[in-house]
């Protein structure tokens, strides 16, 4: 999404939106392009569209969009109908912004029952205080990449003493399973910094060592 004030509807700014040939074909003049006419039409079209609502912008991640699922991977959308390039018109009241490409799950075959069983076995081998914790961890890993499409987003808090291996579980088990459909940050990250990084994305956030060092 590019914000263009009224005074910036000039040749330099407009050719950044579309190539010169586009403007020459729509607004020809003896000297090249009738830029005032192009700016006038853009102003009228903008007024006809109504007030822009920033909350309609959607970043990368999984979304629920009027009865259908949409997986936004930066440069393309994955819907039940197939893959849709982000630069092509897409029927929706929301605006799916073009962003850095994510690989996501595309091109990867789903795990077989036997392969999934290996993952379950690894999760259950960690030294849990409560045996069901391995299953709970896997449940969160499965739901986390589609958190944006869920009405309620599950949270997971991994607790243990210092040096017990929490970071190892996150780095060597959780992170490889999530792939690039997650944001990994350290405990020193501020709320403002986190909001700025996430922006409009709907991806799970993994905090490493998100614990207080203050003593009460």
Q: What positions do the PLM features span?
A:
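Short, flexible loop/turn elements at secondary-structure junctions
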Residues: 75, 162, 209-211
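Short helix/loop capping segments that flank catalytic or ligand/cofactor-binding pockets
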Residues: 79-82, 167, 214-215
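Structured core elements
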Residues: 70-72, 157, 205-206
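P-loop NTPase catalytic core of nucleic-acid-dependent motor ATPases
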Residues: 87-201
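Residue-level signal for secondary-structure boundary elements
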Residues: 31-32, 50-54, 127, 131, ...
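N-terminal nucleic-acid engagement/recognition segments and initiation subdomains in replication
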Residues: 1-117
